Amino acid sequence: MDAKFLEILVCPLCKGPLVFDKSKDELICKGDRLAFPIKDGIPMMLESEARELAPEEEVK
């Protein structure tokens, strides 16, 4: 994920910053504890596409 692109992307719900998880190909919102998938290089930034992080999942 391009660092400049990541700087301008925010969580569509809380407008907070996102963290790129390369191993799972997801963008993580720490505030809402949501993971937005990246499919074919395109972030799926819809709440309906996001998954909730499990309590044991650590956000880096």
Swiss-Prot record:
SUPFAM superfamilies referenced in this protein's UniProt entry, alphabetically: Trm112p-like (SSF158997)
InterPro entries named among the record's database cross-references: Trm112-like
Residues spanning the membrane: none
Entry GO terms, CC: cytosol
Signal peptide bounds: none
HAMAP family xrefs: UPF0434
Family in the record: Belongs to the UPF0434 family.
Name listed for the protein in its UniProt record: UPF0434 protein CV_3345
Lineage: Bacteria, Pseudomonadati, Pseudomonadota, Betaproteobacteria, Neisseriales
